[in-house]
Curated annotation (Swiss-Prot):
<dbReference type="GO" id="GO:0006633">
    <property type="term" value="P:fatty acid biosynthetic process"/>
</dbReference>
<keyword id="KW-0444">Lipid biosynthesis</keyword>
<feature type="active site">
    <location>
        <position position="250"/>
    </location>
</feature>
<dbReference type="InterPro" id="IPR013751">
    <property type="entry name" value="ACP_syn_III_N"/>
</dbReference>
<dbReference type="GO" id="GO:0033818">
    <property type="term" value="F:beta-ketoacyl-acyl-carrier-protein synthase III activity"/>
</dbReference>
<keyword id="KW-0276">Fatty acid metabolism</keyword>
<dbReference type="Pfam" id="PF08541">
    <property type="entry name" value="ACP_syn_III_C"/>
</dbReference>
<dbReference type="InterPro" id="IPR016039">
    <property type="entry name" value="Thiolase-like"/>
</dbReference>
<dbReference type="InterPro" id="IPR013747">
    <property type="entry name" value="ACP_syn_III_C"/>
</dbReference>
<comment type="function">
    <text>Catalyzes the condensation reaction of fatty acid synthesis by the addition to an acyl acceptor of two carbons from malonyl-ACP. Catalyzes the first condensation reaction which initiates fatty acid synthesis and may therefore play a role in governing the total rate of fatty acid production. Possesses both acetoacetyl-ACP synthase and acetyl transacylase activities. Its substrate specificity determines the biosynthesis of branched-chain and/or straight-chain of fatty acids.</text>
</comment>
<feature type="active site">
    <location>
        <position position="114"/>
    </location>
</feature>
<keyword id="KW-0808">Transferase</keyword>
<keyword id="KW-0443">Lipid metabolism</keyword>
<dbReference type="Pfam" id="PF08545">
    <property type="entry name" value="ACP_syn_III"/>
</dbReference>
<comment type="pathway">
    <text>Lipid metabolism; fatty acid biosynthesis.</text>
</comment>
<protein>
    <recommendedName>
        <fullName>Beta-ketoacyl-[acyl-carrier-protein] synthase III</fullName>
        <ecNumber>2.3.1.180</ecNumber>
    </recommendedName>
</protein>
<comment type="similarity">
    <text>Belongs to the thiolase-like superfamily. FabH family.</text>
</comment>
Length: 323
């Protein structure tokens, strides 16, 4: 028998404020058509004043716990993927732990930008596989609206705020690709490309800074690296592309999503797409898409799912799991 990390609950949270593409036309040389044609994005959510990453993460976690029929007392650990924690420290994960009323277990943040949730899932899987935890909340949450340069039309129209969460539970499997739960992971990074996507602020500058991105260069890396990491994870899981029910990719933009599916030889009707409604929510995008995919009735128990993401670093990776 093999100890597996099985998804037993999913939930998400989106701020109330919805910003349509047309709102940017008043302040930028852009248009709804320009944004849609280049990104597939139609709208995004922005956090309200005083609404923080930890607040949104807590709301998503509560939704995941409710869907699983569990309480915060049942959770052993929280792994939170974010690049926009409320403060430099303590971690946003410990803030969520407090807001959920947890007084035991442990919590920590993972920072791999848009690839963060894949890294967080891999960490949570290791905690469960090794017996260090039986139930782990894995959360992706971001408030990228607070690191946007609102004069840069190439970036500020792309990103949104939100949070998504999964509750993983240890269950015994047969050790085959037919098991439920996380079957394989693949993580990668290459710091030579750190200047392609970064924030020009932080402790060393004593400022928050703004997101800076060489979008065309990131795109050049994205499709090749995402397809490659997905294939590697599938191979480690003992599964083939033909067996995949759903790709749930990082929702960066529709061109990367379409390009990766094509490179993998999979049709778009096997891809969960939410970028049109959420924009790029960085580490929150995959758990958001998983939760929405369940709500839509797309993702069902037993489905074989590939999640893949790439972000600043560059960092990229994939997780294969059976729902």
């Amino acid at each position: 028998m093999t100890r597996r990390a099985v998804v037993i609950g999913a939930g998400h949270y989106l701020p109330d404020r919805i910003v349509e593409n047309a709102e940017f036309e008043a302040t930028l040389d852009t248009s709804d058509e320009w944004i849609r044609s280049r990104s597939g994005i139609e709208r995004r959510h922005f956090a309200a004043e005083g609404e923080t990453t930890s607040h949104m993460a807590t709301r998503a976690a509560e939704a995941a716990l409710k869907s699983a029929g569990r309480s915060a007392d049942d959770v052993d650990a929280i792994v939170l993927a974010t690049s926009t924690a409320d403060l430099t420290f303590p971690s946003a994960a410990t803030m969520v732990q407090s807001q959920l009323g947890m007084t035991k277990g442990f919590a920590f943040d993972v920072q791999a930008v848009c690839a963060g949730f894949v890294y967080a899932l891999s960490n949570a899987n290791a905690l469960i596989a090794s017996g260090q935890a039986d139930r782990v909340l894995v959360i992706g949450a971001e408030t990228f609206s607070r690191i946007m340069d609102w004069t840069d039309r190439s970036t500020c129209v792309l990103f949104g705020d939100g949070a998504g969460a999964l509750l993983l539970e240890a269950q015994e499997g047969e050790g085959t690709s037919k098991d439920r739960g996380i079957l394989a992971t693949d993580l990668n990074s290459d710091g030579r490309y750190k200047d392609l996507l970064y924030v020009d602020g932080g402790v060393s500058t004593q400022s928050t800074g703004y997101l800076r991105m060489q979008g065309n260069q990131v795109f050049r890396h994205a499709v090749e690296k995402l397809a490659s990491t997905a294939h590697t994870a599938l191979e480690r899981a003992g599964a083939s592309t033909d067996e995949v029910d759903w790709i749930v990719p990082h929702q960066a933009n529709i061109r990367i999503i379409q390009g990766t599916a094509k490179k993998m030889g999979l049709p778009m009707d096997k891809v969960v797409v939410t970028v049109q409604d959420h924009g790029n929510t960085s580490a929150a995008s995959i758990p958001l898409a998983l939760s929405v995919g369940v709500e839509r009735g797309q993702i069902k128990p037993g489905d074989l799912i590939v999640t893949e993401a790439i972000g600043g670093g560059l960092a990229w990776g994939a997780v294969v799991l059976r729902w």
